[in-house]
């Protein structure tokens, strides 16, 4: 009899994600864990109410730690109400076997010979604790870290969106052999990234994963692997690992680049559709906009030589392109009007030939034209057929001039004036030339020829180099409400650099502070500082939260609701509840070891003695602890300040002052 389709099916993505969520909730979150493991299905996962903390911890303690029988532990765990109900939902026998194998991977991490322990770290989000792996003993290079394994399943982008893994991609790996993206789950997924990792991921079998040490790992060190060169942005520029913190690079760099947002796309998305029928006939706005952006990016990526002649338009533009050009002309006219008539008052005589000595306009006529221009009586007429992409070659000096980006208003006189007998002036606004070498996309030039009916006769216009344009001073501006020129108001600007006297000393240690502005964005101060996950005041936001030093591992931690001070950190306290020994001990170390295992964790007093508690409340120990944390996680800025202070002590001025007092 041929096998059915159900028997042919293997481990799928949805099944593995569901198995891992249920097992991590049962065997990690509900065993004295002080945080919550991030689930693969996000908000769609609901914890089982049939799993109690003491029931699961009792099975792990008796069957795994004391008797070292993980097989019996798996069977007893499946007899608990929550897991028994979940197993009944798996009707296929093969699915039940896969769930048992995945459950066994998590049961093994509580074996006494397991060299690691699942802990947490707040390095990445400061206020939220995420899972991590800490070594419980010394690990040699090229040693397979026992029980730190996982399983992978190939996936597609559609499945990734279905499981809402876009923001939870820390369990996604790309196989260098198969060149496919896979979902990687199991105890090994708790290993975080480091640019100088002490371990690596390797395949084992068909779909298995194993972590192997590449460097000596000491007891208490975090076990890390490398996720890739571009996992956290380009060249891992957003990485917050321990190595980047020591080197003050990537996510820990003193200065951070600000990426420019696409304001035009946002305005286009927010603007309503004027003609729904046209939008429907031409396709959806999203798809059309995406195609347009793709074409733009493709054109911008090509290396275009500086063109001296503009390409002629030989084909009639399509309706879509015509609408785009209409929006472009509206934006151009708005920009021209805002940058010429209001900001820069230009006398009429400035566009005339100075050498011609022709005085055909009186001051009264000039004033009338300006008043009509400001009151909106002068209208703009565009000739659709006169649009051209042809222009004369421009000199590099004119292209680089900042004045070339501004142009005069294209205006025409209303019906009160005789426009038939008046000459016509063609005004071609200048186009800003971008330097392709500065990383800016080269845009093809496009000029819209505008016909201006001037109310006065004028000789033929000459080159721009011969015209003398007068403009307002930088300290003056035109007030559109009062219709007069007023003094420009001071607008404070954000400082992106430090003063010279400060950063010269600061550059002696650490990464130099750049005072330049990047070509594709500004540099601002990075909000993340080295050690801020230990020194941040947001950690003590609760009323009775405080810093406490663990009496077992000498690590500082924040105790929430610290009415009474605890002796141990959450990691050491969880370890002692399970194994009955102080961290990192899991069993007797030989026949000469006479220390008894504590089988009932409830008999252990978890808080400090009353005398020590009184000392802590006086504030002396608390102040010393804060100073030690500040010195341990001091930023390079504080180190530089201490260096500058030491230089001042050794200076001659200081020595002379000492000699005078003596």
UniProtKB/Swiss-Prot annotation:
Residues 252-418, 627-662 are annotated as: Disordered. The keyword Cytoplasm does not apply. PROSITE patterns: SAM_MT43_SUVAR420_1, SET. Residues 653-662 have a biased composition (Basic residues). GO terms for cellular component: chromosome; nucleus. Keywords: Chromatin regulator, Chromosome, Methyltransferase, Nucleus, S-adenosyl-L-methionine, Transferase. Residues 260-271 have a biased composition (Acidic residues). The keyword Oxidoreductase does not apply. Belongs to the class V-like SAM-binding methyltransferase superfamily. Histone-lysine methyltransferase family. Suvar4-20 subfamily. Histone methyltransferase that trimethylates 'Lys-20' of histone H4 to form H4K20me3. This is Histone-lysine N-methyltransferase SET9. It comes from Phaeosphaeria nodorum (strain SN15 / ATCC MYA-4574 / FGSC 10173) (Glume blotch fungus). The gene is SET9.
């Amino acid at each position: 009899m041929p096998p059915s389709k159900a028997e042919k099916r293997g481990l799928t993505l949805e099944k593995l994600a569901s198995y891992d969520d249920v097992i991590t909730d049962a065997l990690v979150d509900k065993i004295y864990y002080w945080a919550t493991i991030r689930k693969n299905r996000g908000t769609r996962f609901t914890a089982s109410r049939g799993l109690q903390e003491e029931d699961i911890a009792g099975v792990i303690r008796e069957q795994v730690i004391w008797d070292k029988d993980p097989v019996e532990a798996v069977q007893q765990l499946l007899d608990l109400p929550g897991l028994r109900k979940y197993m009944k939902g798996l009707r296929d026998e093969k699915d039940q076997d896969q769930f048992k194998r995945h459950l066994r991977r998590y049961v093994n991490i509580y074996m006494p010979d397991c060299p690691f322990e699942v802990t947490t770290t707040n390095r990445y989000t400061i206020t939220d604790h995420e899972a991590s792996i800490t070594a419980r003993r010394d690990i040699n290079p090229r040693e397979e870290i026992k029980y730190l394994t996982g399983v992978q399943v190939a996936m597609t982008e559609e499945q990734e969106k279905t499981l809402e893994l876009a923001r939870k991609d820390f369990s996604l790996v790309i196989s260098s052999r198969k060149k496919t993206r896979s979902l990687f789950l199991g105890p090994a997924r708790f290993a975080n990234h480091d640019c100088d990792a002490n371990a690596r991921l390797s395949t084992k079998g068909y779909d298995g994963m194993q972590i192997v040490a590449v460097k000596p790992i000491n007891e208490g060190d975090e076990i890390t692997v490398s996720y890739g060169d571009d996992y956290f942005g380009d060249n891992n520029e957003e990485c917050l690992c321990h190595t980047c913190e020591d080197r003050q690079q990537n996510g820990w760099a003193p200065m951070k680049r600000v990426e420019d947002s696409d304001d035009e796309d946002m305005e286009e998305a927010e603007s309503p559709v004027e003609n729904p029928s046209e939008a429907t006939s031409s396709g959806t706005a999203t798809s059309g906009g995406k195609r347009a952006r793709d074409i733009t990016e493709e054109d911008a990526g090509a290396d275009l030589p500086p063109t001296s002649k503009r390409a002629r338009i030989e084909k009639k533009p399509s309706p879509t392109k015509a609408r785009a050009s209409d929006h472009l002309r509206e934006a151009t006219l708005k920009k021209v009007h805002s940058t010429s008539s209001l900001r820069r008052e230009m006398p009429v005589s400035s566009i005339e030939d100075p050498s011609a000595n022709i005085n055909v306009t009186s001051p009264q006529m000039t004033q009338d034209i300006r008043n009509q221009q400001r009151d909106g009586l002068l209208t703009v007429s565009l000739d659709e057929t006169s649009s051209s992409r042809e222009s004369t070659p421009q000199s590099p000096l004119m292209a680089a001039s900042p004045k070339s980006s501004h142009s005069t208003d294209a205006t025409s006189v209303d019906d009160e004036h005789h426009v038939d007998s008046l000459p016509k002036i063609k005004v071609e606004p200048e186009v800003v030339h971008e330097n392709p070498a500065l990383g800016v996309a080269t845009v093809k030039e496009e000029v819209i020829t505008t016909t201006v009916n001037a109310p006065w006769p004028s000789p033929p216009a000459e080159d721009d180099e011969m015209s003398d344009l007068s403009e307002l001073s930088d300290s003056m501006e035109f007030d559109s409400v009062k219709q007069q020129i007023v003094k420009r108001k001071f607008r404070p600007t954000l400082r992106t650099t430090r003063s010279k006297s400060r950063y010269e000393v600061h550059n002696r240690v650490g990464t130099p502070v750049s005072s330049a502005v990047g070509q594709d964005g500004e540099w601002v101060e990075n909000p993340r500082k080295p050690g801020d996950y230990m020194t941040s005041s947001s950690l003590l936001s609760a009323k009775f939260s405080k810093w406490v030093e663990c009496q077992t591992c000498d690590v500082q931690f924040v105790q929430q609701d610290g009415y009474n001070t605890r002796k141990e950190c959450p990691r050491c306290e969880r370890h002692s509840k399970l194994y009955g020994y102080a961290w990192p001990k899991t069993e007797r170390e030989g026949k000469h070891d006479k220390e008894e295992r504590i089988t009932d964790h409830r008999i252990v007093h978890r808080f400090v003695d009353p005398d020590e508690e009184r000392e802590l409340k006086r504030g002396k120990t608390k102040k010393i602890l804060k100073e030690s944390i500040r010195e341990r996680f001091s930023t390079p800025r504080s180190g530089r300040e201490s260096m500058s202070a030491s230089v001042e002590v050794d200076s001659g001025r200081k020595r002379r002052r000492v000699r005078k007092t003596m």
